[in-house]
């Protein structure tokens, strides 16, 4: 049996730091869906957001805190009373609430960002922890840019915040500057030079600017860290964060070396990765470790021969261990409501009768149009029907004329604020014409940053899944749509992005946490 001192706690910040990745903004329903999945996975702590950033963030964190019972819920707060008070208001109903407060500690940040002395910052750090501690004993403190902070001052700050009541001290590699040997030595140095370090859990938060976030986190574990802050798929600002699935599977696969374990149900990893991709539209690179499309693919004849004879010749873990099924059940037009319901449960979707009815109607429409309906088809339907923002704009009708002679023309009818509007658009191709019609009907003209088409499954009758990224006032959103007709899918994706932008406008004035 695994001993408690060998337990590594997983702190997931997909909903906070991960959401800072360009185009990855999520609405409250999507955040709640991710939080439920994280709870199902066995994540120990969910950082639900930055409550003071906006009213939308506050309400989203509050909703997660009120529903999720199987994980600690953390709210981020800068080292000031207003942030800390607001964070507590958002998370107070959680089964086990945590306030995560932070302040910069490196001389670079003190000089150019805070414009404060070391003494001032130390005093503010202690005061912040004391304030948070007045609400809950579960307080985490982070000295931002710790890897570029003078070690003597870092030790002084860590000792002071632990004395003030911090139960977890997190060491962030904010700019992804450290290398594994150096980062591991830093954790060992803190353990050796902070007298009260045993009174707190040491956590690490690594960024991937040099591609070393996972390696740095593992090095920290070998040197005494017992909590790792990470995100699904490694999503995050700039080059991203520590990928949860990679840390978890490294510890599991090389238990002979590490000797540690997590509480993560690894069979939920792949579904979690797919869900995040569906929601954000941020695709996983094919050669991504653990969850990439090629992670368990072997093309070399020698490798294939070895796998046929004995899988352990070239596979260090099984696809099933991360939730990739080796059996691919296909549904069709004769599949009934119960079969669809049971299949959705296997995919991790426990739907209400009302939700199932919506999905089943879309399923029957799709099954009548194509021979086989695959897992990916069902996932696309579930996302589009159940996890989208409230619609200001809806597609009612689309007809496109195109070819090598005709000028591409799109005639479209939409519902705009419950009013029916019709217009036509022209362009250099059918998609361009469709987008032109949408812009005319909605009176919008945002920058189109990205347009991507993927086949959800194989075959000429595969659904097309389209991702569209639009930019508004320096912020971007991703919309997506799926349909057997790629032009219709494109229209749905563009309209979905517009609806997400409308949500962002309502949540305008959002404050960025600055913490990474």
UniProtKB/Swiss-Prot annotation:
Its cofactor is Mn(2+). InterPro entries: 2-IPM_HCS-like (IPR050073), 2-isopropylmalate_synth_dimer (IPR013709), AIPM/Hcit_synth_CS (IPR002034), Aldolase_TIM (IPR013785), LeuA/HCS_post-cat (IPR054691), LeuA_allosteric_dom_sf (IPR036230), LeuA_bact_synth (IPR005671), PYR_CT (IPR000891). Pathway: Amino-acid biosynthesis; L-leucine biosynthesis; L-leucine from 3-methyl-2-oxobutanoate: step 1/4. One of its GO terms (biological process) is L-leucine biosynthetic process. This is 2-isopropylmalate synthase. The keyword Cytoplasm applies. Its main location: cytoplasm. The gene is leuA. The lineage of its organism: Bacteria, Pseudomonadati, Thermodesulfobacteriota, Syntrophia, Syntrophales. It is found in: Cytoplasm. Keywords: Amino-acid biosynthesis, Branched-chain amino acid biosynthesis, Cytoplasm, Leucine biosynthesis, Manganese, Metal-binding, Transferase. Transmembrane segments: none annotated.
């Amino acid at each position: 049996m695994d001993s408690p001192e060998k337990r590594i706690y997983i702190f997931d910040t997909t909903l906070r730091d991960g959401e800072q990745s360009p185009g990855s903004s999520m609405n409250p329903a999507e955040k709640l869906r991710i939080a439920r999945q994280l709870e199902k996975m066995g994540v120990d702590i969910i950082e639900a957001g930055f409550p003071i950033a906006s009213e939308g963030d506050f309400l989203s964190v509050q909703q997660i805190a009120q529903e999720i019972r199987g994980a600690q819920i953390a709210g981020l707060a800068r080292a000031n009373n207003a942030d800390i008070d607001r964070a507590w208001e958002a998370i107070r109903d959680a089964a086990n609430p945590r306030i995560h407060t932070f302040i910069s500690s490196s001389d670079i940040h003190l000089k150019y960002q805070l414009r404060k002395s070391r003494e001032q910052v130390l005093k503010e750090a202690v005061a912040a922890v004391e304030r948070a501690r007045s609400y809950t004993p579960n307080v985490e403190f982070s000295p931002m840019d710790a890897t570029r902070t003078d070690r003597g001052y870092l030790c002084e700050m860590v000792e002071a915040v632990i004395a003030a009541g911090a139960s977890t001290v997190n060491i962030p590699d904010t700019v992804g500057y450290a290398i594994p040997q150096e980062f591991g030595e830093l954790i060992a140095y803190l353990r050796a030079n902070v007298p009260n370090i045993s009174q707190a859990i040491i956590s690490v938060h690594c960024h991937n600017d040099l591609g070393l976030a996972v390696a740095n986190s593992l090095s920290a574990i070998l040197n005494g860290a017992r909590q790792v802050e990470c995100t699904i798929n490694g999503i995050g600002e700039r080059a991203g964060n520590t990928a949860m699935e990679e840390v978890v599977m490294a510890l599991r696969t090389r238990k002979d070396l590490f000797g540690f374990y997590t509480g993560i149900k690894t069979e939920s990893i792949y579904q979690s990765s797919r869900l995040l991709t569906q929601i954000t539209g941020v695709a996983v690179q094919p050669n991504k470790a653990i969850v990439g499309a090629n992670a368990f693919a072997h093309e070399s004849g020698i490798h294939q021969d070895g796998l046929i004879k004995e899988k352990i010749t070239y596979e260090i873990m099984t696809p099933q261990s991360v939730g990739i099924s080796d059996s691919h059940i296909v549904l069709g037009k004769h599949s009934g409501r119960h079969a669809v319901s049971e299949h959705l449960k296997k995919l991790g979707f426990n739907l209400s009768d009302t939700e199932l009815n919506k999905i089943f109607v879309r399923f029957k429409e799709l099954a009548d149009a194509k021979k086989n309906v695959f897992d990916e088809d069902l996932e696309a339907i579930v996302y589009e029907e159940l996890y989208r923002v409230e619609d200001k704009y809806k597609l009612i009708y689309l007809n496109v004329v195109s070819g090598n002679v005709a000028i591409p023309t799109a005639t479209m009818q939409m519902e705009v604020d419950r009013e029916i509007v019709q217009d036509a658009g022209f362009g250099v191709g059918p998609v361009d014409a469709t987008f032109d019609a949408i812009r005319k009907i909605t009176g919008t003209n945002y920058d189109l940053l990205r347009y991507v088409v993927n086949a959800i499954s194989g075959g000429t009758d595969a659904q097309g899944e389209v991702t569209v990224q639009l930019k508004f006032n320096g912020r971007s959103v991703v919309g997506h749509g799926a349909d057997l007709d790629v032009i219709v899918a494109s229209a749905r994706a563009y309209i979905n992005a517009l609806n997400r932008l409308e949500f962002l406008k309502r949540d305008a004035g959002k404050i960025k946490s600055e913490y990474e």
